A protein has these predicted regions:
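Conserved phosphate-donor/acceptor-positioning beta-strand/loop module used by diverse small-molecule
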Residues: 86-90, 100-124
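P-loop (Walker A) phosphate-binding loop of NTP-binding proteins
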Residues: 10
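Walker A/P-loop
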Residues: 15-16
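Hydrophobic anchor at the beta1->P-loop junction of P-loop NTPases
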Residues: 7
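Post-Walker A helix-loop "phosphate-sensing" segment adjacent to the P-loop in P-loop NTPases
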Residues: 24-31
Length: 156
């Protein structure tokens, strides 16, 4: 049995939906740090630990992985990764994990059709953010294949 579950997927793929369902069933989510502002309905310590950019610069040594996406920093602390069993990572974040940590993880790749993602992204972002996110995701997920299972269910 693998020790960690890692959810990976582009914007609007259902990562938070799956995370919440798994937490309801007893999984312990490792909350990431971010420098971006909270979205409507997000809560400190539940969805993210919201910190300013100076926090990331002065605390680099606490992170197991640290990535930048659309000018915002994201990272999982070593402490969270050592005691939790459910995570959301980007392909770059997954790739930056030590091999032994990746080998001990089961990666779920959420990959619904782009039109489904666009609809979901428009519900939470303005049009410019949606287009920018789609372009960034296309680059980030180009030839991504480091997963154990891929879910493409449109109703997910």
């Amino acid at each position: 049995m693998r020790g960690k579950i890692i959810i990976v997927g582009p914007g609007g793929s259902g990562k938070d939906f799956l995370r919440k369902k798994m937490v309801e069933r007893g999984f312990d989510y490792g909350v990431s740090f971010t420098s971006r502002p909270p979205r409507e309905g997000e809560k400190e310590g539940i969805d993210y630990y919201y910190r300013d950019i100076n926090f990331f610069e002065s605390n680099k040594n606490i992170f197991l992985e640290l990535q930048e996406f659309n000018e915002w920093k994201y990272g999982i602390s070593k402490g969270e990764f050592s005691i939790k069993n459910l995570f959301i990572l980007s392909p770059a974040g997954l790739k930056s994990l030590p091999k032994s940590f990746r080998d001990d993880s089961f990666v779920i790749y959420l990959n619904p059709a782009e039109d489904t993602r666009v609809k979901r992204l428009k519900e939470r972002n303005d049009a410019d953010d949606v287009e920018r996110r789609l372009i960034a995701d296309q680059k980030d997920f180009f030839e991504f294949s480091d997963y154990d299972i891929m879910i493409t269910n449109e109703d997910f």
